[in-house]
Amino acid sequence: MKPSERICAALDFPTFAAAEPFARAVAPEVGLLKVGLELFAAEGPAAVRGAARLGRPVFLDLKLHDIPNTVEGAARSAAASGAALLTVHAAGGAEMVRAAVRGAGPGVRVLAVTVLTSLDAAALDAVGLAGPPEAAVVRLARLAVVAGAGGIVCSPHEVAAVRAAVGPGPLLVVPGVRPAGAAKGDQARVATPAEAVRAGADVIVVGRPLRDAPDPAAAARAIAAGL
């Protein structure tokens, strides 16, 4: 995999009209484009189709978490929109993950989100998940892979432990990456792009450091050069 192919640019914008100039600029420099909740809530499948027209696979990051039947239907609809990857919460349980895989079909890779990168140990303890984040992440990753997930989403702090737990097959997608010196924002468990890849990440998700850069394409090239 070329370094640029490891970068997923997050289209964190309120509308596709706002996202499109950025997406067109970075698409030649990255491997994937991510449509998240904000953009999908505003425009639905049209946002996925618009991003796909730019020639890169689309990562639809909805983090589905509902009863299995509902998630299966949502995954089927996501596949019909043209998404290549789709996220669900591993905490929804093994049957929910299996339902998502059935609904998505063979053309869409279902990724299971373990623990959000905005949560630290204190935040996890407050919601009843006592102990280090790594333990929860590894437990959820194993559950999801056994249930058929094609990949795992985890922070750069846990990616090495997840790789050791699930083996070489699943795609490991890592948000919460920030170039050296960049602001952390609302992320609690972060690392640089190079650190994440060295730890075992296949794909890194980059949002604000690209979106807020004066020249997003140049920023993407700089990240790729450091991988």
Swiss-Prot record:
<feature type="binding site">
    <location>
        <position position="34"/>
    </location>
    <ligand>
        <name>substrate</name>
    </ligand>
</feature>
<keyword id="KW-0665">Pyrimidine biosynthesis</keyword>
<feature type="binding site">
    <location>
        <position position="117"/>
    </location>
    <ligand>
        <name>substrate</name>
    </ligand>
</feature>
<comment type="subunit">
    <text>Homodimer.</text>
</comment>
<protein>
    <recommendedName>
        <fullName>Orotidine 5'-phosphate decarboxylase</fullName>
        <ecNumber>4.1.1.23</ecNumber>
    </recommendedName>
</protein>
<comment type="pathway">
    <text>Pyrimidine metabolism; UMP biosynthesis via de novo pathway; UMP from orotate: step 2/2.</text>
</comment>
<dbReference type="Pfam" id="PF00215">
    <property type="entry name" value="OMPdecase"/>
</dbReference>
<feature type="binding site">
    <location>
        <position position="207"/>
    </location>
    <ligand>
        <name>substrate</name>
    </ligand>
</feature>
<dbReference type="InterPro" id="IPR014732">
    <property type="entry name" value="OMPdecase"/>
</dbReference>
<dbReference type="InterPro" id="IPR047596">
    <property type="entry name" value="OMPdecase_bac"/>
</dbReference>
<keyword id="KW-0456">Lyase</keyword>
<keyword id="KW-0210">Decarboxylase</keyword>
<feature type="binding site">
    <location>
        <position position="12"/>
    </location>
    <ligand>
        <name>substrate</name>
    </ligand>
</feature>
<dbReference type="GO" id="GO:0005829">
    <property type="term" value="C:cytosol"/>
</dbReference>
<feature type="binding site">
    <location>
        <position position="208"/>
    </location>
    <ligand>
        <name>substrate</name>
    </ligand>
</feature>
<feature type="binding site">
    <location>
        <begin position="61"/>
        <end position="70"/>
    </location>
    <ligand>
        <name>substrate</name>
    </ligand>
</feature>
<dbReference type="InterPro" id="IPR013785">
    <property type="entry name" value="Aldolase_TIM"/>
</dbReference>
<dbReference type="GO" id="GO:0006207">
    <property type="term" value="P:'de novo' pyrimidine nucleobase biosynthetic process"/>
</dbReference>
<feature type="active site" description="Proton donor">
    <location>
        <position position="63"/>
    </location>
</feature>
<comment type="function">
    <text>Catalyzes the decarboxylation of orotidine 5'-monophosphate (OMP) to uridine 5'-monophosphate (UMP).</text>
</comment>
<comment type="similarity">
    <text>Belongs to the OMP decarboxylase family. Type 1 subfamily.</text>
</comment>
<feature type="binding site">
    <location>
        <position position="178"/>
    </location>
    <ligand>
        <name>substrate</name>
    </ligand>
</feature>
<dbReference type="GO" id="GO:0004590">
    <property type="term" value="F:orotidine-5'-phosphate decarboxylase activity"/>
</dbReference>
<dbReference type="InterPro" id="IPR001754">
    <property type="entry name" value="OMPdeCOase_dom"/>
</dbReference>
<dbReference type="InterPro" id="IPR018089">
    <property type="entry name" value="OMPdecase_AS"/>
</dbReference>
<feature type="binding site">
    <location>
        <position position="187"/>
    </location>
    <ligand>
        <name>substrate</name>
    </ligand>
</feature>
<dbReference type="InterPro" id="IPR011060">
    <property type="entry name" value="RibuloseP-bd_barrel"/>
</dbReference>
<dbReference type="GO" id="GO:0044205">
    <property type="term" value="P:'de novo' UMP biosynthetic process"/>
</dbReference>
